[in-house]
Amino acid sequence: MATTGRVLLLSPPSLSSHPEKLNTVLKSHTRDKTDLQMLDRLAHGLVSLPESTYDIVLLLTGADNTLAETHSLLNRELIQRVVHSLRPAGKLRNRENKPWGLSDGNGNNANSSRRYNDDEQRFRNEVILAGLVFDDKGELLKPDIGAQQAIPLKLGRRKKEKEKTDTLASSANYITNGTVDAPASNGISAPIPAAKTTENNPVPPGVGFIDFSDDFGVPAEDDLEDSDEELIDEDELLDEDDMGRQIVQPPECRPKPGKRRRACKDCSCGLSQKLEAKDKAQRATADKALETMKLGSSELAEVDFTVQGKVGSCGNCSLGDAFRCDGCPYIGLPAFKPGEEVRLLNNDVQL
């Protein structure tokens, strides 16, 4: 199978005991553009995959020529790592390069009448949750998010624009050439000077006004007709099954080997409270253990290691180094024997 771009081959561990099958697969690919990784080593974190590197990730079949072993090893974390290693518009294929087919929601393949087993259905669900989509040919494709275009939001300003236009039109009927026609007492209308405008009475410096009718450059005729759509309740987006799933910790948040797990600054995921509660529980357990080791005054006994009735010429040198004088020539020697008399005269030992 000739392919262009970098290719990653994911092999189950059972294929390593059949080198002839593995060599057959490797012969059909260009070695300088092909990498081979074992799924069990990836699952245990012994090796890592580079991000946005491969154009095609190929899942190899096991020794039984099925993908059962491969599906059983591909958990959620490993699938996300594989998807991150794909480039935008990269594809996830199997060894036979057969299309995965489209699922109809009941676990059935639109291209065949068989029903997927639990591992296959779980694999299909996990790759979709990881961000892959099915293209027109039934292949799993990583969408190119960077190629998508941003759509500007339409602000509902149609009513305000219409009211503003009607107000200006009605004002124009009464104000002409800076005067307002007002009825007089004799039935003759008399011109009255109009109010001063902002040109005649400018706004004082440092004073600003907010125009809430501003449409931010979006024409009123381009506004959406259904601007008052029903809002989606965010509490209904996740059900109990989603809330009970295990949280996947990002690699950058995992503690390094041999180091204690620490929470980020301004932690909002609950890890800080969890670690604080764990520390309090450990401190309480240690304090409780220390309480059992404390002894009362009645349980303490004083031990005297002094040899009774044995003194030297100074009164202490026969008891050992701890009781000898600073200038005693016997410092560093064992204690005298019981009953042995020692006398010092001019710093000379007299036995």
Swiss-Prot record:
Its main location: cytoplasm. It holds the Pfam family CIAPIN1. InterPro entries: Anamorsin (IPR007785), CIAPIN1 (IPR046408), Dre2_N (IPR031838). [4Fe-4S] cluster binds at C314, C317, C325, C328. GO terms for biological process: iron-sulfur cluster assembly. Residues 152-243 are annotated as: Linker. Its cofactor is [2Fe-2S] cluster; [4Fe-4S] cluster. GO terms for cellular component: mitochondrial intermembrane space. [2Fe-2S] cluster binds at C253, C264, C267, C269. The keyword Glycoprotein does not apply. One of its GO terms (molecular function) is 4 iron, 4 sulfur cluster binding. It comes from the Eukaryota. Residues 314-328 are annotated as: Fe-S binding site B. Residues 1-151 are annotated as: N-terminal SAM-like domain. Residues 253-269 are annotated as: Fe-S binding site A. Residues 105-114 have a biased composition (Polar residues). Keywords: 2Fe-2S, 4Fe-4S, Cytoplasm, Iron, Iron-sulfur, Metal-binding, Mitochondrion. It is found in: Cytoplasm; Mitochondrion intermembrane space. Component of the cytosolic iron-sulfur (Fe-S) protein assembly (CIA) machinery required for the maturation of extramitochondrial Fe-S proteins. Part of an electron transfer chain functioning in an early step of cytosolic Fe-S biogenesis, facilitating the de novo assembly of a [4Fe-4S] cluster on the scaffold complex CFD1-NBP35. Electrons are transferred to DRE2 from NADPH via the FAD- and FMN-containing protein TAH18. Belongs to the anamorsin family. The C-terminal domain binds 2 Fe-S clusters but is otherwise mostly in an intrinsically disordered conformation. This is Fe-S cluster assembly protein DRE2. It comes from Ajellomyces capsulatus (strain G186AR / H82 / ATCC MYA-2454 / RMSCC 2432). The lineage of its organism: Eukaryota, Fungi, Dikarya, Ascomycota, Pezizomycotina. The gene is DRE2.
